[in-house]
């Protein structure tokens, strides 16, 4: 069973950031395709399809401007922003901010940890029935 991830992006992203987002999605599909199903990308604030978790392949400053939208999703969030398929070290500030808002945020620092987290989120769906 694969975890269903819905990647979120920010409308405020510039052209360079949009390309980096697309490049990161390619990498993440390579790293995690064996444990994750990647749903279509959704802009922060828009409705999301049925999913197990939210994926942030990129975090930008705009995250600080979307409190209501982000807290409204009620799904765990996984931050995989580095080119190595883990969390970028400077994203800790946004991760901490999201946690302070009450979001459940996972920011794995290696691929093995990320896969354990993703598998656990997928299993949760099975256990709920």
Named regions from a protein language model:
Residues 1-129:
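An N-terminal assembly and electron-transfer interface module characteristic of large anaerobic redox
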């Amino acid at each position: 069973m694969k975890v269903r991830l819905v990647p979120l992006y920010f409308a405020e992203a510039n052209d360079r950031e949009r390309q980096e987002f697309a490049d990161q999605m390619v990498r993440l599909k390579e790293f995690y395709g064996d444990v994750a199903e990647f749903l279509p990308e959704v802009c922060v604030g828009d409705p999301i399809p049925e999913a197990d978790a939210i994926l942030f392949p990129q975090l930008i400053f705009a995250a600080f401007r979307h409190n209501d939208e982000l807290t409204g999703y009620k799904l765990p969030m996984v931050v995989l922003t580095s080119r190595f398929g883990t969390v970028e070290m400077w994203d800790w500030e946004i991760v901490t901010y999201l946690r302070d808002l009450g979001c459940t945020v996972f920011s794995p620092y290696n691929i093995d940890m990320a896969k354990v987290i993703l598998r656990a989120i997928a299993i949760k769906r099975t256990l709920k029935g």
